[in-house]
Amino acid sequence: MIVTDRGSLKAYRVNETPTRGPSLQLVQAFNITDAHGRLIDKVSDSAGRFPVTEGAGPHRGPASIAERTQLATETDRRIQKELADQIAKIVSQNESDGWSFAAPAEIHAAIVDLLPSAVRQRIVEHVKSDLVKVEAARLNTHFRSLRQI
């Protein structure tokens, strides 16, 4: 089972216990440093930026906003690609037939689309929710495949 959000990822091994149902063991945790902090803190050339003016000309406000939006979009794309690469590596190293995946709805589809098809086809359950901060003992309540019958 893998749970992720925009900045971190946790992989759990599901161990079946005959009396208590499934138990989860954390096997890997991963944080992406680019996902944390403000965009202005990451742009190294803030001293050389052109002033933004309200009037017409090459340095008016909207161009500056568009540049920041492009940079934020590119950063999001890189983070999602890095998460997909880490997921592919974890799933490839694991011998189980299927795995469950949880991510916030706003990034879930993008990450799944970036996964190699062999990894994507092994997903047995999709949960569109941010479960990274949920403690392991309570995660099984969010996955139908882990609930006791």
Regions found by a protein language model. Name each.
Residues 1-149:
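Terminal alpha-helical anchor/extension segments at protein ends
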